[in-house]
Protein backbone atom coordinates (compact mmCIF):
# COMPACT_ATOMS: atom_id res chain seq x y z
CA UNK A 1 0.00 0.00 0.00
CA UNK A 2 1.42 3.38 -1.00
CA UNK A 3 1.95 6.33 1.31
CA UNK A 4 -1.00 8.17 -0.24
CA UNK A 5 -3.33 5.27 0.54
CA UNK A 6 -2.11 5.10 4.14
CA UNK A 7 -2.55 8.88 4.57
CA UNK A 8 -6.09 8.69 3.18
CA UNK A 9 -6.94 5.85 5.56
CA UNK A 10 -5.43 7.80 8.47
CA UNK A 11 -7.50 10.90 7.73
CA UNK A 12 -10.61 8.77 7.32
CA UNK A 13 -10.10 7.13 10.70
CA UNK A 14 -9.46 10.51 12.34
CA UNK A 15 -12.73 11.91 11.01
CA UNK A 16 -14.66 8.86 12.20
CA UNK A 17 -12.96 9.23 15.58
CA UNK A 18 -14.00 12.90 15.86
CA UNK A 19 -17.68 12.24 15.06
CA UNK A 20 -18.42 9.25 17.30
CA UNK A 21 -19.03 8.47 20.95
CA UNK A 22 -16.67 6.75 23.36
CA UNK A 23 -18.14 3.33 22.59
CA UNK A 24 -17.83 4.10 18.88
CA UNK A 25 -14.15 4.86 19.35
CA UNK A 26 -13.68 1.50 21.07
CA UNK A 27 -15.46 -0.20 18.16
CA UNK A 28 -13.16 1.59 15.73
CA UNK A 29 -10.12 0.36 17.68
CA UNK A 30 -11.39 -3.21 17.56
CA UNK A 31 -12.07 -2.88 13.84
CA UNK A 32 -8.60 -1.56 13.05
CA UNK A 33 -6.54 -3.77 15.37
CA UNK A 34 -8.42 -7.07 15.57
CA UNK A 35 -9.89 -7.15 12.09
CA UNK A 36 -7.86 -5.23 9.58
CA UNK A 37 -4.41 -5.86 11.05
CA UNK A 38 -5.16 -9.40 12.20
CA UNK A 39 -6.67 -10.38 8.86
CA UNK A 40 -3.92 -8.72 6.83
CA UNK A 41 -1.04 -10.12 8.88
CA UNK A 42 -2.20 -13.36 10.53
CA UNK A 43 -4.79 -14.59 8.07
CA UNK A 44 -2.61 -14.09 5.02
CA UNK A 45 0.24 -16.11 6.51
CA UNK A 46 -1.96 -18.86 7.94
CA UNK A 47 -4.14 -19.36 4.86
CA UNK A 48 -1.46 -18.78 2.25
CA UNK A 49 -1.13 -22.54 1.56
CA UNK A 50 -4.76 -23.50 1.93
CA UNK A 51 -5.09 -24.63 -1.68
CA UNK A 52 -1.53 -25.64 -2.48
CA UNK A 53 -1.34 -27.99 0.51
CA UNK A 54 -4.85 -29.36 0.06
CA UNK A 55 -4.16 -32.85 -1.29
CA UNK A 56 -6.39 -35.80 -2.09
CA UNK A 57 -5.45 -39.51 -2.32
CA UNK A 58 -5.96 -39.69 -6.07
CA UNK A 59 -4.09 -38.76 -9.22
CA UNK A 60 -7.17 -37.94 -11.20
CA UNK A 61 -6.65 -34.55 -12.90
CA UNK A 62 -9.01 -31.90 -11.57
CA UNK A 63 -10.12 -33.89 -8.55
CA UNK A 64 -8.14 -31.71 -6.11
CA UNK A 65 -9.67 -28.48 -7.42
CA UNK A 66 -13.21 -29.83 -7.33
CA UNK A 67 -12.80 -31.17 -3.82
CA UNK A 68 -11.29 -27.89 -2.55
CA UNK A 69 -14.26 -26.00 -4.02
CA UNK A 70 -16.59 -28.33 -2.13
CA UNK A 71 -14.54 -27.88 1.07
CA UNK A 72 -14.36 -24.05 0.95
CA UNK A 73 -16.79 -22.40 -1.50
CA UNK A 74 -15.36 -19.03 -0.39
CA UNK A 75 -11.89 -18.54 0.98
CA UNK A 76 -11.74 -17.62 4.65
CA UNK A 77 -9.51 -14.61 4.11
CA UNK A 78 -11.61 -13.23 1.27
CA UNK A 79 -14.78 -13.72 3.30
CA UNK A 80 -13.31 -11.71 6.19
CA UNK A 81 -12.07 -8.96 3.87
CA UNK A 82 -15.52 -8.67 2.33
CA UNK A 83 -17.01 -8.59 5.84
CA UNK A 84 -14.73 -5.70 6.86
CA UNK A 85 -15.64 -3.71 3.75
CA UNK A 86 -19.40 -4.19 4.13
CA UNK A 87 -19.46 -3.45 7.86
CA UNK A 88 -17.35 -0.31 7.42
CA UNK A 89 -19.61 1.03 4.66
CA UNK A 90 -22.31 2.51 7.00
CA UNK A 91 -19.64 4.33 8.99
CA UNK A 92 -18.05 5.73 5.84
CA UNK A 93 -21.43 6.89 4.55
CA UNK A 94 -22.20 8.51 7.90
CA UNK A 95 -18.83 10.24 7.82
CA UNK A 96 -19.49 11.60 4.33
CA UNK A 97 -22.88 12.93 5.40
CA UNK A 98 -21.41 14.50 8.55
CA UNK A 99 -18.61 16.24 6.65
CA UNK A 100 -21.08 17.54 4.05
CA UNK A 101 -23.50 18.82 6.70
CA UNK A 102 -20.78 20.50 8.74
CA UNK A 103 -19.35 22.12 5.60
CA UNK A 104 -22.78 23.54 4.74
CA UNK A 105 -23.25 24.70 8.34
CA UNK A 106 -19.88 26.48 8.34
CA UNK A 107 -20.73 28.18 5.04
CA UNK A 108 -24.08 29.34 6.40
CA UNK A 109 -22.39 30.61 9.57
CA UNK A 110 -19.89 32.54 7.46
CA UNK A 111 -22.67 34.17 5.45
CA UNK A 112 -24.63 34.93 8.61
CA UNK A 113 -21.54 36.53 10.14
CA UNK A 114 -21.11 38.73 7.08
CA UNK A 115 -24.74 39.83 7.37
CA UNK A 116 -24.36 40.58 11.08
CA UNK A 117 -21.27 42.71 10.46
CA UNK A 118 -22.05 46.48 10.66
CA UNK A 119 -22.21 48.16 7.27
CA UNK A 120 -23.88 50.84 5.24
CA UNK A 121 -25.89 48.59 2.95
CA UNK A 122 -29.41 49.72 2.17
CA UNK A 123 -32.42 47.67 1.31
CA UNK A 124 -33.52 48.33 -2.27
CA UNK A 125 -36.98 49.84 -2.59
CA UNK A 126 -37.97 47.29 -5.20
CA UNK A 127 -37.62 44.41 -2.75
CA UNK A 128 -39.91 45.91 -0.11
CA UNK A 129 -43.32 44.19 0.03
CA UNK A 130 -46.43 46.30 -0.60
CA UNK A 131 -48.06 47.62 2.60
CA UNK A 132 -51.42 46.24 3.78
CA UNK A 133 -54.58 48.26 3.04
CA UNK A 134 -54.81 51.32 5.29
CA UNK A 135 -51.12 51.40 6.13
CA UNK A 136 -48.80 54.25 5.09
CA UNK A 137 -46.79 53.79 1.94
CA UNK A 138 -43.23 52.57 2.49
CA UNK A 139 -41.91 55.21 0.09
CA UNK A 140 -43.05 57.98 2.47
CA UNK A 141 -41.06 56.76 5.44
CA UNK A 142 -38.11 59.00 4.67
CA UNK A 143 -34.54 58.16 3.81
CA UNK A 144 -33.47 54.58 4.43
CA UNK A 145 -31.36 54.05 7.52
CA UNK A 146 -28.14 51.96 7.45
CA UNK A 147 -28.67 48.32 8.27
CA UNK A 148 -26.69 47.37 11.37
CA UNK A 149 -27.77 43.78 11.86
CA UNK A 150 -30.02 41.13 10.46
CA UNK A 151 -31.42 38.38 12.63
CA UNK A 152 -32.09 35.02 10.98
CA UNK A 153 -34.01 32.17 12.59
CA UNK A 154 -33.82 29.75 9.69
CA UNK A 155 -31.95 26.45 9.89
CA UNK A 156 -31.51 26.76 13.63
CA UNK A 157 -32.18 23.65 15.76
CA UNK A 158 -32.81 23.38 19.62
CA UNK A 159 -29.13 22.93 20.34
CA UNK A 160 -27.58 24.84 17.65
CA UNK A 161 -24.70 27.37 18.22
CA UNK A 162 -25.55 31.04 18.56
CA UNK A 163 -22.93 32.38 16.20
CA UNK A 164 -19.29 32.21 15.15
CA UNK A 165 -16.85 32.69 17.94
CA UNK A 166 -19.55 32.39 20.63
CA UNK A 167 -18.91 28.86 21.83
CA UNK A 168 -19.79 28.24 25.42
CA UNK A 169 -17.54 26.59 27.96
CA UNK A 170 -19.39 23.32 27.49
CA UNK A 171 -18.80 23.33 23.74
CA UNK A 172 -15.11 24.14 24.18
CA UNK A 173 -14.83 21.30 26.68
CA UNK A 174 -16.51 18.97 24.20
CA UNK A 175 -14.07 19.97 21.46
CA UNK A 176 -11.10 19.37 23.74
CA UNK A 177 -12.50 16.02 24.85
CA UNK A 178 -13.16 15.01 21.24
CA UNK A 179 -9.58 15.82 20.22
CA UNK A 180 -8.30 13.78 23.13
CA UNK A 181 -5.79 16.19 24.58
CA UNK A 182 -3.86 19.38 24.26
CA UNK A 183 -0.84 20.30 22.24
CA UNK A 184 1.71 18.81 24.66
CA UNK A 185 0.42 15.27 24.20
CA UNK A 186 -1.25 15.02 27.61
CA UNK A 187 -4.83 13.97 27.95
CA UNK A 188 -7.07 16.75 29.14
CA UNK A 189 -9.76 15.63 31.56
CA UNK A 190 -12.64 18.05 31.76
CA UNK A 191 -14.48 17.90 35.09
CA UNK A 192 -18.21 18.18 35.35
CA UNK A 193 -20.99 16.99 33.08
CA UNK A 194 -19.43 18.63 30.00
CA UNK A 195 -16.61 16.08 29.95
CA UNK A 196 -18.76 13.02 30.65
CA UNK A 197 -20.94 12.74 27.56
CA UNK A 198 -18.06 11.47 25.34
CA UNK A 199 -19.22 13.07 22.10
CA UNK A 200 -22.92 12.28 22.44
CA UNK A 201 -24.00 15.87 23.04
CA UNK A 202 -21.70 17.06 20.30
CA UNK A 203 -23.46 14.73 17.86
CA UNK A 204 -26.81 16.09 19.08
CA UNK A 205 -25.64 19.68 18.71
CA UNK A 206 -24.49 19.02 15.14
CA UNK A 207 -27.84 17.43 14.25
CA UNK A 208 -26.36 14.01 13.37
CA UNK A 209 -28.03 11.83 15.97
CA UNK A 210 -30.61 10.20 13.69
CA UNK A 211 -28.07 9.35 11.02
CA UNK A 212 -25.68 8.03 13.65
CA UNK A 213 -28.30 5.73 15.15
CA UNK A 214 -29.34 4.56 11.68
CA UNK A 215 -25.78 3.56 10.78
CA UNK A 216 -25.50 1.73 14.11
CA UNK A 217 -28.61 -0.31 13.33
CA UNK A 218 -27.41 -1.14 9.80
CA UNK A 219 -23.98 -2.09 11.08
CA UNK A 220 -25.44 -4.40 13.72
CA UNK A 221 -27.65 -6.05 11.09
CA UNK A 222 -24.60 -6.68 8.88
CA UNK A 223 -22.75 -8.20 11.83
CA UNK A 224 -25.56 -10.65 12.48
CA UNK A 225 -25.81 -11.55 8.78
CA UNK A 226 -22.09 -12.28 8.48
CA UNK A 227 -22.07 -14.32 11.67
CA UNK A 228 -24.84 -16.52 10.30
CA UNK A 229 -23.11 -16.81 6.92
CA UNK A 230 -19.79 -17.74 8.49
CA UNK A 231 -21.43 -20.47 10.53
CA UNK A 232 -23.22 -21.89 7.49
CA UNK A 233 -20.03 -21.89 5.40
CA UNK A 234 -17.35 -23.02 7.86
CA UNK A 235 -18.97 -23.99 11.15
CA UNK A 236 -16.81 -23.74 14.28
CA UNK A 237 -13.99 -26.07 13.27
CA UNK A 238 -11.67 -26.70 10.34
CA UNK A 239 -11.68 -30.52 9.88
CA UNK A 240 -8.31 -32.24 9.30
CA UNK A 241 -9.64 -34.23 6.32
CA UNK A 242 -12.58 -34.00 3.95
CA UNK A 243 -14.36 -36.79 2.05
CA UNK A 244 -15.11 -35.83 -1.53
CA UNK A 245 -17.25 -37.67 -4.06
CA UNK A 246 -17.61 -35.12 -6.83
CA UNK A 247 -16.85 -35.67 -10.44
CA UNK A 248 -14.28 -36.25 -11.96
CA UNK A 249 -13.09 -38.14 -8.88
CA UNK A 250 -13.43 -41.91 -9.66
CA UNK A 251 -14.75 -42.68 -6.18
CA UNK A 252 -15.06 -41.20 -2.70
CA UNK A 253 -11.64 -39.80 -1.95
CA UNK A 254 -10.16 -38.40 1.25
CA UNK A 255 -8.61 -34.94 1.10
CA UNK A 256 -6.31 -33.53 3.79
CA UNK A 257 -6.15 -29.93 5.05
CA UNK A 258 -2.92 -28.17 6.02
CA UNK A 259 -2.59 -26.94 9.67
CA UNK A 260 -6.22 -27.51 10.67
CA UNK A 261 -5.71 -26.71 14.37
CA UNK A 262 -4.15 -23.32 13.70
CA UNK A 263 -6.89 -22.45 11.26
CA UNK A 264 -9.54 -23.54 13.76
CA UNK A 265 -8.09 -21.24 16.41
CA UNK A 266 -7.99 -18.33 13.99
CA UNK A 267 -11.58 -19.04 12.93
CA UNK A 268 -12.74 -18.94 16.54
CA UNK A 269 -10.84 -15.68 17.08
CA UNK A 270 -12.72 -14.12 14.19
CA UNK A 271 -16.00 -15.33 15.70
CA UNK A 272 -15.10 -13.64 18.97
CA UNK A 273 -14.15 -10.41 17.21
CA UNK A 274 -17.46 -10.37 15.33
CA UNK A 275 -19.43 -10.97 18.52
CA UNK A 276 -17.45 -8.24 20.29
CA UNK A 277 -18.22 -5.73 17.54
CA UNK A 278 -21.91 -6.66 17.68
CA UNK A 279 -21.91 -6.23 21.46
CA UNK A 280 -20.25 -2.82 21.13
CA UNK A 281 -22.93 -1.76 18.66
CA UNK A 282 -25.68 -2.76 21.07
CA UNK A 283 -23.91 -1.04 23.97
CA UNK A 284 -23.55 2.14 21.95
CA UNK A 285 -27.25 2.19 21.10
CA UNK A 286 -28.09 1.65 24.78
CA UNK A 287 -25.65 4.41 25.73
CA UNK A 288 -27.31 6.87 23.36
CA UNK A 289 -30.81 5.93 24.51
CA UNK A 290 -30.04 6.17 28.23
CA UNK A 291 -28.10 9.41 27.78
CA UNK A 292 -30.97 11.03 25.89
CA UNK A 293 -33.42 9.89 28.58
CA UNK A 294 -31.22 11.34 31.33
CA UNK A 295 -30.96 14.65 29.48
CA UNK A 296 -34.75 14.79 29.14
CA UNK A 297 -35.23 14.11 32.87
CA UNK A 298 -32.66 16.74 33.83
CA UNK A 299 -34.29 19.25 31.52
CA UNK A 300 -37.70 18.70 33.11
CA UNK A 301 -36.26 18.99 36.61
CA UNK A 302 -34.45 22.18 35.70
CA UNK A 303 -37.57 23.68 34.15
CA UNK A 304 -39.66 22.82 37.22
CA UNK A 305 -37.02 24.17 39.62
CA UNK A 306 -36.54 27.40 37.69
CA UNK A 307 -40.18 28.40 38.18
CA UNK A 308 -41.96 30.98 36.05
CA UNK A 309 -39.77 32.79 33.61
CA UNK A 310 -39.33 36.56 33.27
CA UNK A 311 -42.15 38.81 32.18
CA UNK A 312 -42.51 38.67 28.41
CA UNK A 313 -41.49 41.77 26.53
CA UNK A 314 -44.41 43.78 25.10
CA UNK A 315 -44.78 43.69 21.33
CA UNK A 316 -42.91 46.43 19.49
CA UNK A 317 -46.09 47.77 17.90
CA UNK A 318 -47.68 48.82 21.23
CA UNK A 319 -46.23 52.36 21.48
CA UNK A 320 -45.58 53.29 17.84
CA UNK A 321 -49.00 52.08 16.68
CA UNK A 322 -50.80 54.08 19.39
CA UNK A 323 -48.78 57.19 18.59
CA UNK A 324 -49.34 56.95 14.84
CA UNK A 325 -52.98 55.91 15.10
CA UNK A 326 -52.37 52.56 13.39
CA UNK A 327 -53.50 49.07 14.33
CA UNK A 328 -51.35 45.97 13.78
CA UNK A 329 -52.91 43.03 11.90
CA UNK A 330 -52.98 39.64 13.69
CA UNK A 331 -49.57 37.95 14.05
CA UNK A 332 -47.79 41.06 12.73
CA UNK A 333 -45.56 43.61 14.43
CA UNK A 334 -45.19 47.22 13.34
CA UNK A 335 -41.54 48.10 12.99
CA UNK A 336 -40.63 51.80 13.20
CA UNK A 337 -37.20 53.19 12.51
CA UNK A 338 -35.28 54.34 15.57
CA UNK A 339 -34.62 57.79 14.08
CA UNK A 340 -38.31 58.50 13.44
CA UNK A 341 -39.25 57.29 16.90
CA UNK A 342 -36.58 59.55 18.43
CA UNK A 343 -37.82 62.56 16.47
CA UNK A 344 -41.40 61.90 17.56
CA UNK A 345 -40.24 61.59 21.17
CA UNK A 346 -38.36 64.92 20.99
CA UNK A 347 -41.39 66.64 19.45
CA UNK A 348 -43.62 65.32 22.24
CA UNK A 349 -41.20 66.64 24.86
CA UNK A 350 -41.11 70.07 23.18
CA UNK A 351 -44.91 70.23 23.04
CA UNK A 352 -45.18 69.30 26.71
CA UNK A 353 -42.62 71.95 27.70
CA UNK A 354 -44.41 74.67 25.68
CA UNK A 355 -47.77 73.75 27.21
CA UNK A 356 -46.25 73.85 30.68
CA UNK A 357 -44.86 77.35 30.03
CA UNK A 358 -48.23 78.57 28.81
CA UNK A 359 -50.06 77.12 31.81
CA UNK A 360 -47.53 78.69 34.18
CA UNK A 361 -47.89 82.13 32.58
CA UNK A 362 -51.70 81.95 32.79
CA UNK A 363 -51.63 80.92 36.45
CA UNK A 364 -49.20 83.74 37.27
CA UNK A 365 -51.40 86.34 35.55
CA UNK A 366 -54.52 85.18 37.40
CA UNK A 367 -52.77 85.25 40.77
CA UNK A 368 -51.38 88.75 40.09
CA UNK A 369 -54.86 90.08 39.27
CA UNK A 370 -56.28 88.61 42.46
CA UNK A 371 -53.52 90.00 44.72
CA UNK A 372 -53.46 93.65 43.33
CA UNK A 373 -55.45 96.25 45.48
CA UNK A 374 -58.38 98.10 43.90
CA UNK A 375 -57.84 101.70 42.69
CA UNK A 376 -58.89 104.33 45.30
CA UNK A 377 -61.58 106.86 44.33
CA UNK A 378 -63.17 104.62 41.67
CA UNK A 379 -66.39 102.78 42.20
CA UNK A 380 -66.92 99.13 41.28
CA UNK A 381 -68.93 100.04 38.18
CA UNK A 382 -66.16 102.10 36.62
CA UNK A 383 -63.52 99.44 37.51
CA UNK A 384 -65.50 96.71 35.86
CA UNK A 385 -66.22 98.64 32.64
CA UNK A 386 -64.31 97.46 29.56
CA UNK A 387 -61.42 99.59 28.40
CA UNK A 388 -61.38 100.97 24.86
CA UNK A 389 -57.84 101.64 23.68
CA UNK A 390 -56.88 104.43 21.30
CA UNK A 391 -60.20 106.42 21.64
CA UNK A 392 -59.57 108.51 24.81
CA UNK A 393 -59.06 112.27 24.38
CA UNK A 394 -55.96 114.13 25.35
CA UNK A 395 -57.63 115.52 28.45
CA UNK A 396 -58.88 112.06 29.43
CA UNK A 397 -55.49 110.59 28.78
CA UNK A 398 -53.86 113.21 30.87
CA UNK A 399 -56.38 112.71 33.60
CA UNK A 400 -55.93 108.96 33.56
CA UNK A 401 -52.21 109.36 33.37
CA UNK A 402 -52.24 111.73 36.28
CA UNK A 403 -54.44 109.41 38.25
CA UNK A 404 -52.07 106.52 37.71
CA UNK A 405 -49.12 108.69 38.65
CA UNK A 406 -50.85 109.87 41.78
CA UNK A 407 -51.60 106.28 42.79
CA UNK A 408 -47.93 105.55 42.78
CA UNK A 409 -47.03 108.38 45.20
CA UNK A 410 -47.60 108.37 49.00
CA UNK A 411 -50.65 110.27 50.18
CA UNK A 412 -52.41 109.72 46.89
CA UNK A 413 -55.72 108.93 48.56
CA UNK A 414 -55.89 112.36 50.30
CA UNK A 415 -55.12 114.22 47.04
CA UNK A 416 -57.64 112.21 45.07
CA UNK A 417 -60.30 113.00 47.66
CA UNK A 418 -60.08 116.72 46.75
CA UNK A 419 -60.08 116.25 42.93
CA UNK A 420 -63.08 114.20 41.93
CA UNK A 421 -65.21 117.31 41.24
CA UNK A 422 -62.68 118.96 38.98
CA UNK A 423 -62.18 115.81 37.03
CA UNK A 424 -65.90 115.50 36.44
CA UNK A 425 -66.11 119.04 35.18
CA UNK A 426 -63.28 118.50 32.75
CA UNK A 427 -64.93 115.37 31.49
CA UNK A 428 -68.20 117.22 30.95
CA UNK A 429 -66.44 120.03 29.13
CA UNK A 430 -64.81 117.52 26.81
CA UNK A 431 -68.17 115.99 25.96
CA UNK A 432 -69.66 119.43 25.23
CA UNK A 433 -66.95 120.03 22.62
CA UNK A 434 -68.05 116.91 20.73
CA UNK A 435 -65.08 114.75 21.61
CA UNK A 436 -65.64 111.14 22.65
CA UNK A 437 -64.67 110.66 26.26
CA UNK A 438 -64.48 107.50 28.36
CA UNK A 439 -64.98 107.62 32.15
CA UNK A 440 -62.41 105.67 34.06
UniProtKB/Swiss-Prot annotation:
Q: Which GO terms describe its biological process?
A: cell-cell signaling; response to toxic substance
| Residue ranges crossing the lipid bilayer per the database entry | 22-42, 79-99, 224-244, 265-285
Q: Disrupted gene: resulting phenotype?
A: Mice display myelination abnormalities characterized by extracellular vacuolation along nerve fibers. Mice lacking both Gja12 and Gjb1 display a more severe demyelination phenotype associated with oligodendrocyte death. These mice develop action tremors, tonic seizures, sporadic convulsions and loss of consciousness preceding death in the sixth week after birth.
- A matching Pfam family: Connexin
The UniProt regions of compositional bias labelled Acidic residues, in chain numbering, are 150-173
Query: Which positions carry Phosphoserine?
Result: 372
In this entry, the parts of the chain located on the Extracellular side of the membrane are 43-78, 245-264
Which residues fall in a compositionally biased region of kind Low complexity? 136-149, 388-401
Tissue distribution of the protein: Mainly expressed by oligodendrocytes in the central nervous system (at protein level).
Q: Which UniProt keywords apply?
A: Cell junction, Cell membrane, Gap junction, Membrane, Phosphoprotein, Transmembrane, Transmembrane helix
Which region is the signal sequence? Answer: none
Quaternary organization:
A connexon is composed of a hexamer of connexins. Interacts with TJP1.
> What name is this protein filed under?
Gap junction gamma-2 protein
**The gene coding this protein:** Gjc2
Amino acid sequence: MTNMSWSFLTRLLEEIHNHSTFVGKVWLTVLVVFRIVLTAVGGESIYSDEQSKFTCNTRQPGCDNVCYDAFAPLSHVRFWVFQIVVISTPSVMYLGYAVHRLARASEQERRRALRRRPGTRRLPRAQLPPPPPGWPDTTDLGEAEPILALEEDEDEEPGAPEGPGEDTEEERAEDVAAKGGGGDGKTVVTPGPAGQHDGRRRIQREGLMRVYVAQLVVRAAFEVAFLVGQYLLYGFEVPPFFACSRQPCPHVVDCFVSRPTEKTVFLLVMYVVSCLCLLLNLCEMAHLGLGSAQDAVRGRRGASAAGPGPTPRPPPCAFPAAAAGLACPPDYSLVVRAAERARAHDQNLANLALQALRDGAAVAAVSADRDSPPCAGLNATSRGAPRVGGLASGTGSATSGGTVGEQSRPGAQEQLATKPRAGSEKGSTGSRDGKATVWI
